[in-house]
């Protein structure tokens, strides 16, 4: 009783330091051998001595590829084609083009991304003086631009003789007119050895839309575009390759022999990274494909998966992956855990796989179960270098598909690649079932509410992540990981009542706006 009175009066000198320890460190938490989801966990706030704008979200996608924002769009046929991939890269992340299509269709999608934003365009579309205005019209319809250099041969490397832009062609009715009659021949050019900064300076001063780059013989070797100056100004976080300053883009493929032909075509198109798209990545097929890619296409990074255990990680790391994709049966449209009785709660899977893979400097992508900004922050806190989003981005203007209305709501279709609908189109390769007479679905088809454009939605996510890291007292993704593994960031397990308390409650009605 005397001890209790001392505590109540604040005079007790026998306080024990362990009484004041808040929460668990990550190792204590996951030694309990429970399977945790993101919602099961909460992180405790840290000390703030910097602004949210000072938070750096620069991170690794693979061993060799960096992103300016830890966001990746999923290779699903209702999520990522060229529009999504372009905008994800402009905003600092990356898009992975799905492969529920023909090789030719996937290659076209990749090329559209790589052509969208360039430093020096080393493979510009070129025409000859004998081509017609109708040829320019076809190029504009297919690629969306009409500023075309003209060489005597109609190919890169030919002698530059002119350039054709919309100013030369807009008001000419006869589209059979040859380009020699309308092209501009009084040209301002850059020399082959000029830097990108010098080329941009010339574009600014001459107020032209295109700047042909020529060698000492006057032969066309490259092209610089004024449009790209504007894009650099409007999208300073854009993720680009180091060599040509083109937007980064990834593509998915399978592990069949026919996928080697797809890989060759994707390599020619300039893809930066490929994801081996399988619901269960620890297979002989995937290990062999990883070795094939690293042996024959050393400049292309390969991400393996999906995995959820350390033994799966070990298997693919030994095969030579540059990154891993973690998650099995946790997506909103995925039924793998329910149907196959196989998978793992995502928070536990991310922590275990990230901790193991960190020994080999192999980054992981937390794939699935992302419904809120909080889930993104938790995935990063548990060791993921980036997060992959499907349902979060489905329903945006840039996602494939058309909007439709139901019960007054504007919706877009969203389906799992393991749904019967997607399997019929080709997604069954992902589930090793393309030869099965009876298909067993591991996903569903549904719809999601219109979210507007990713040009507004993704910056909202990025700002939210920055504020979340600020609350934890971490000024970068790297600092976050160090603080988690060092025990500075503390965790607690939330009871069911705590989860209710931590979400919207006790209201008759409310509205929830993303932006």
Swiss-Prot record:
Keywords: CBS domain, Cytoplasm, GMP biosynthesis, Metal-binding, NAD, Oxidoreductase, Potassium, Purine biosynthesis, Repeat. Induction: Down-regulated by Legionella pneumophila infection. One of its GO terms (molecular function) is IMP dehydrogenase activity. InterPro entries: Aldolase_TIM, CBS_dom, CBS_dom_sf, IMP_DH, IMP_DH/GMP_Rdtase_CS, IMP_DH_GMPRt. It catalyses: IMP + NAD(+) + H2O = XMP + NADH + H(+). The keyword Metal-binding applies. It comes from the Eukaryota. Transmembrane segments: none annotated. It is found in: Cytoplasm. NAD(+) binds at residues 277-279, 327-329. GO terms for biological process: GMP biosynthetic process; GTP biosynthetic process. Belongs to the IMPDH/GMPR family. This is Inosine-5'-monophosphate dehydrogenase.
């Amino acid at each position: 009783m005397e001890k209790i009175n001392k505590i109540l009066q604040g005079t007790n000198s026998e306080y024990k330091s362990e009484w004041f320890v808040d929460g668990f460190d990550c190792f204590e938490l996951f030694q309990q051998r429970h399977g945790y989801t993101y919602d099961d966990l909460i992180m405790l706030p840290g000390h703030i001595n910097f602004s949210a704008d000072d938070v750096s979200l620069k991170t690794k996608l693979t061993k060799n590829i960096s992103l300016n924002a830890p966001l990746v769009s999923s290779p699903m046929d209702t999520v990522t084609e060229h529009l999504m991939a372009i905008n994800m890269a402009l905003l600092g992340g990356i898009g992975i083009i799905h492969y529920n299509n023909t090789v030719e269709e996937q290659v076209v999608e990749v090329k559209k991304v790589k052509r969208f934003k360039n430093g020096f365009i080393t493979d510009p579309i070129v025409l000859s003086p004998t081509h017609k205005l109708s040829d320019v019209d076809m190029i504009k319809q297919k690629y969306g631009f009409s500023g075309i250099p003209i060489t005597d041969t109609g190919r890169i490397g030919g002698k530059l003789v002119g350039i054709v832009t919309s100013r030369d062609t807009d008001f000419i009715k006869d589209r059979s007119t040859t380009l020699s009659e309308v092209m501009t021949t009084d040209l301002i050019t850059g020399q082959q050895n000029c830097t990108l900064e010098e080329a941009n300076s010339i574009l600014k001063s001459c107020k032209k839309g295109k700047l042909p780059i020529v060698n000492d013989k006057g032969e066309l070797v490259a092209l610089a575009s004024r449009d790209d100056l504007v894009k650099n100004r409007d999208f300073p976080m854009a993720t680009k390759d180091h060599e040509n300053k083109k937007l980064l883009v990834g593509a998915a493929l399978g592990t069949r022999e026919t996928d080697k032909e797809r890989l060759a075509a994707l390599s020619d198109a300039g893809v930066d990274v490929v994801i081996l798209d399988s619901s269960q990545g620890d297979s002989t097929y995937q290990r062999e494909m990883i070795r094939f890619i690293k042996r024959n296409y050393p400049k292309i990074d390969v991400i393996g998966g999906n995995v959820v255990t350390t033994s799966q990680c070990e298997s693919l790391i030994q095969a030579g992956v540059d990154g891993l994709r973690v998650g099995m049966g946790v997506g909103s449209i995925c039924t793998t855990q329910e149907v196959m009785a196989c998978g793992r709660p995502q928070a536990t899977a991310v922590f275990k796989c990230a901790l193991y893979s960190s020994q080999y400097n192999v980054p992981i992508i937390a794939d699935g179960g992302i419904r809120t900004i909080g889930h993104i922050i938790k995935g990063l806190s548990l060791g993921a270098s980036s997060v992959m989003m499907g349902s979060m981005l489905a329903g945006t203007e840039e996602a494939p598909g058309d909007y439709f209305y139901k019960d007054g709501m504007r919706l877009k279709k969203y389906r799992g690649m393991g749904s019967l609908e997607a399997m019929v189109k080709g997604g069954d390769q992902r589930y090793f079932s393309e030869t099965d007479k009876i298909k067993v679905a591991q996903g569903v088809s549904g719809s999601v509410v219109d979210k507007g454009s990713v040009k507004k939605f993704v910056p909202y996510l990025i700002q939210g992540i920055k504020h979340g890291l600020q609350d934890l007292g971490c000024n970068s993704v790297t600092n976050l990981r160090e603080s988690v593994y060092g025990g500075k960031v503390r965790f607690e397990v939330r009871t069911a009542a705590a989860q209710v308390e931590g979400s919207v409650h006790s209201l008759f009605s409310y509205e929830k706006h993303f932006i």
